[in-house]
């Protein structure tokens, strides 16, 4: 029960941070830049309103994998020991997993280890997001098509899976070039530019996250019951 509560709190905290960005952006562009800087690694000083919204959606989508779905999977497979091993790898990646001059040597290992841990969960997350889109009135079919087409449109082998599902479900385009530590990193776009993102898309993304997490919890519980009966 404590572990399930921990997962719920992780999703809740992520949703609260994303909602904080939405509210800050309603106040001013500068407030939005400052607030989104709490949840993204990219430089935020010159972000436009659109870029702030996209950055927030991308962050929720990416962290849905490594902050919610992956821990659920590893806790189910190996209990607290495997769950905490994953958490340690994820934390190390967040701290030093940058492929720049400063962190190149140790950062490479941290980033690659995190890629391995999240390889399977990222794909599970994308599929569950496509399914979760339907009861929310989002476009699950387009989400699936976008995942099939754009799942490789990222420097990471995992990030674009959940981001493409989010882009397709919401009908917005994510990705593109970002600036990290003063250096521009060129990234492909994800999804179709059907319409510009709006503040309400952050709320839609949060709801998509919670329903996806619920589906994963049901899946894990179902598998556990089957194993127990065997």
Regions found by a protein language model. Give the residues of each.
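Solvent-exposed interhelical
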Residues: 94
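Hydrophobic alpha-helical transmembrane segments
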Residues: 1-85, 89, 97-230
